[in-house]
């Protein structure tokens, strides 16, 4: 049975919700799924004063965990059109795994959130995907088999490169039903690909 890791960073809970949806989709495909988050780099007093969501249930990942999975789906909010520094810092520690080729052939995917429709969703996904390709991973996006990609009757995230959500400038908008459906679809597709490749 394929093992899938949903690895995320979420300051305010939007990506945490998307990570749970990705995991639901992967489980639906028959994979064993773990959800883990990367360490917070913001000092605790600053995080609390900034109203970060500090009660997230997922355990904190270690870089060595990555080698234990057949698929790794990476999610993080955007910071100026690229992945958040917390995720970048974590992935930057994978040099030893990269040098050994420990991630070659694993399935990868990316998901993100931005404050606005044009807040850097695709560039943030690319910043994650670039890392996955350097690791030698097989990248799976959010294909157009997901009909929600074509919705024009509502503001919604989603790109062929990965599932996305729009949070609003003040963070008050939570992932919509369509955005969560996209995350589930991508999780299922990634797990199905991992099962085909790794059994």
Curated annotation (Swiss-Prot):
Pfam families in the record: FMN_red (PF03358)
Keywords on record: Flavoprotein, FMN, NAD, NADP, Nucleotide-binding, Oxidoreductase
A GO molecular-function descriptor: NADP binding
InterPro entries: Flavodoxin/NO_synth, Flavoprotein-like_sf, Flavoprotein_WrbA-like, FMN_Rdtase-like_dom, NQO
A Gene Ontology cellular-component term: membrane
Binding site for substrate: 98
SUPFAM superfamilies linked: Flavoproteins
UniProt record similarity statement: Belongs to the WrbA family.
HAMAP family per the UniProt record, alphabetical: NQOR
Entry protein name: NAD(P)H dehydrogenase (quinone)
Protein's organism: Rhodopseudomonas palustris (strain BisB5)
């Amino acid at each position: 049975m394929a093992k899938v890791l949903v690895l995320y960073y979420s300051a305010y809970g939007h990506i945490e919700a998307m990570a749970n949806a990705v995991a639901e989709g992967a489980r639906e495909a028959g994979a064993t799924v773990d959800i883990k988050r990367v360490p917070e780099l913001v000092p605790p007093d600053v995080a609390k004063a900034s109203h970060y969501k500090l009660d997230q249930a997922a355990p904190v990942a270690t870089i060595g965990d990555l080698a234990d999975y057949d698929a790794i789906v990476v999610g993080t909010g955007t910071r100026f059109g690229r992945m958040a520094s917390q995720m970048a810092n974590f992935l930057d520690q994978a040099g030893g795994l990269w040098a050994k080729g420990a991630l070659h052939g694993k399935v990868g995917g990316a998901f993100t959130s931005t404050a606005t429709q044009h807040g850097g969703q695709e560039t943030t996904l690319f910043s994650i995907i670039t890392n996955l390709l350097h690791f030698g991973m097989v990248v799976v996006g959010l294909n157009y088999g997901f009909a929600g990609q074509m919705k024009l009757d509502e503001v919604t995230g989603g790109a062929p490169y990965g599932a996305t959500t729009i949070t609003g400038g003040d963070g008050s908008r939570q992932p919509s039903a369509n955005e969560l459906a996209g995350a589930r679809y991508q999780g299922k597709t990634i797990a199905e690909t991992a099962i085909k490749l790794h059994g």
